[in-house]
Amino acid sequence: MSKPRILLNLFHPNINNSRGNKILSERVRDLTELTFRDVYREYPDAKINVEHEQQLLLDHDLIVFQHPFYWYSCPSLLKEWEDRVLEQGFAYPPGIGDKLNGKHWLTVITTGGPEDAYRSGGFNNYTISELLRPFQQTANLCGMKWLPPIVVHSVLPAGIEGFKNISDDEIMKHAEEYREFLEGYTME
């Protein structure tokens, strides 16, 4: 079993005003086998350097996509990144674009809603697993192993009243579990 080279791509349009993603990323960014990137900070104009991004993917084994779960999806720069970087001939189709075959994909998200809102018949009508299917299928098409996502629920900005909102201490507990997961992860 080998220790993976980890690429953590943080996609948050305003990380300085974040609670959840800020705490999560700060807790793991110093891991020795991890390359940490704040993609919004790197591309404030959204002009993605495709060749650079593809090389980063080639140089790593476990690719982590960390972001808030906006409108049942991701921040716009992550969608742009997927459209540009995971291009035909590089990431797909099988047998032609197979550069990512065997790499692992981990999604790490924060939601504003509580866990029970993400179920059949719940406020959001669908489970997180169902809502993340487009990402899972993207990983599948690219020949990557989809890992069960890490989800931190009920993370709202400070000062929002009337909704369940976990404390920074609770977020830190999730951040510790996230760190332990990355530290102990092996490529199998």
Where do the PLM segments sit?
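Helix-loop-strand module that forms the ligand-binding subsite of alpha/beta enzymes
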Residues: 51-136, 142
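Glycine-rich phosphate/pyrophosphate-binding loop and the adjoining helix
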Residues: 136-188
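N-terminal beta1-alpha1-beta2 submodule of the flavodoxin-like/Rossmannoid cofactor-binding fold
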Residues: 1-93, 176-188
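Short aromatic-enriched loop/helix-cap "lid" or pocket-rim segments at secondary-structure transitions
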Residues: 20-22, 118-120, 159-162
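Structural signal for conserved beta-strand scaffold positions within catalytic alpha/beta enzyme cores
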Residues: 8, 36-38, 107, 148-151
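A short, flexible beta-alpha/helix-coil linker loop
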Residues: 13, 112-116, 154-157
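Residue-level preference for long, well-ordered alpha-helices that form the structural scaffold
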Residues: 17, 49, 124-131, 163, ...
